[in-house]
């Protein structure tokens, strides 16, 4: 009888997670932040926007309350600090520049996919996420290996973190190829920005740690846990004050970014990182804290044999017209194609910058 009760309780717990996952909406797009720079100006077409300046920097202790991104936060609220969440750039001595919007975006997707994993991990299933130039398809692959309750939680969190980060890598690629997602502006000035993917990976790590420790959190509880986790992470990375962050960015004017350019001009951003890896070092030379995500479970089985993401040709293939035919003609791309796409982007940018007389510099220690 006692064994039956334990089984029933386990079933009820799993059902509770599955019901929650079925009611949970995927994160809506991305938080509209942040091109690298400070006091950024904008223009609409050829007309500069008067009285507009985007400071783009937040204080280490004033990033606000995390909210699972269900789309309720306005663009102006996130950008201008009118929402409970305040996003922007923070300089840390160990992690370099951190974009809190990127941290939060990938944390939210890690949470979302973790919830889906409770019902689908080890089974045959797929879901389609809204297109970012290509349709984003998340696929679960059937497995025969039984998992204990603890293993399922760990596997679910690790697979969610990796998949969420893969989505972030794709977002950088889609930005470069001209995706438009915020207010009708393209995002060329943000594509492959040097702090982006490091920040995304930090978000994946924080969410993974939260979910392994406390897997039954609802969105409000997860958001509260992220508040503490982000605050702790910034402290451990030795985050500096808002004024120091601003000074650090201003010192890079003409090296990593160009204050004379107005958004959405692509060349407002000069220095980009096209290296797509699961092991990342900060681009700022004195920052030394490496972040890594594993491609395998502790059994050495590749995570993507359980859960993978693919990018399927949709209605915006003209964005990829100039790609070499060997990759352009593939109807589905996977993470294995990412570096080839990034290498192409890097070469195109090098050629364009050479013609424009723009030179990117790495900072000397």
Language-model-derived ranges and their functions:
Residues 189-195:
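A glycine-rich, coil/turn loop motif that links secondary-structure elements
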Residues 4, 17-18:
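Targeting-peptide/extracellular-domain and disordered-appendage signature
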Residues 1-7:
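Bacterial N-terminal signal peptides that target proteins for export
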Residues 167, 196-198, 206:
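Short, hydrophobic, well-ordered secondary-structure elements
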Residues 172, 196, 202:
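Divalent metal-coordination and catalytic microenvironments
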Residues 184, 199-204:
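Long, internal stretches of domain cores in catalytic or enzyme-like folds
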């Amino acid at each position: 009888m006692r064994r039956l009760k334990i089984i029933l309780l386990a079933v009820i717990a799993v059902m509770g997670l599955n019901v929650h996952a079925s009611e949970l909406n995927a994160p809506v797009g991305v938080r509209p932040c942040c091109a690298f720079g400070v006091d950024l100006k904008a223009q609409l077409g050829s007309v500069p926007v008067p009285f507009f300046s985007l400071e783009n920097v937040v204080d280490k202790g004033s990033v606000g309350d995390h909210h699972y991104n269900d789309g309720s936060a306005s663009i102006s609220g996130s950008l201008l600090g009118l929402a409970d969440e305040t996003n922007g750039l923070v300089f840390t001595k160990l992690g370099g520049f951190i974009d809190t919007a990127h941290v939060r975006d990938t944390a939210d997707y890690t949470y979302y996919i973790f919830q889906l994993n409770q019902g689908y991990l080890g089974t045959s299933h797929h879901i389609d996420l809204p297109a970012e130039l290509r349709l984003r398809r998340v696929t679960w692959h059937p497995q025969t290996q039984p998992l204990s309750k603890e293993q399922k939680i760990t596997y679910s969190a690790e697979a969610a973190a990796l998949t969420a980060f893969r989505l972030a890598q794709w977002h950088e690629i889609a930005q470069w190829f001209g995706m438009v997602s915020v207010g009708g502006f393209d995002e060329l000035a943000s594509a492959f920005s040097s702090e982006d993917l490091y920040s995304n990976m930090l978000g994946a790590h924080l969410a993974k740690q939260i979910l392994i420790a406390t897997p039954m959190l609802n969105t409000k509880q997860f958001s509260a846990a992220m508040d503490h986790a982000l605050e702790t992470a910034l402290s451990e990375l030795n985050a500096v004050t808002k004024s120091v962050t601003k000074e650090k960015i201003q010192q890079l004017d003409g090296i990593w970014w160009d204050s004379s350019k107005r958004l959405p001009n692509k060349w407002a951003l000069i220095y980009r990182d096209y290296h797509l890896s699961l092991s990342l070092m900060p681009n700022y030379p004195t920052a030394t804290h490496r972040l890594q995500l594993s491609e395998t479970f502790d059994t050495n089985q590749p995570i993507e044999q359980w859960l993978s993401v693919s990018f399927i040709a949709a209605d915006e293939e003209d964005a990829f017209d100039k790609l070499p035919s060997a990759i352009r003609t593939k109807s589905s791309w996977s993470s294995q194609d990412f570096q080839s796409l990034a290498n192409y982007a890097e070469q195109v940018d090098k050629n364009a910058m050479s013609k424009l007389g723009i030179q990117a510099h790495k900072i000397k220690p």
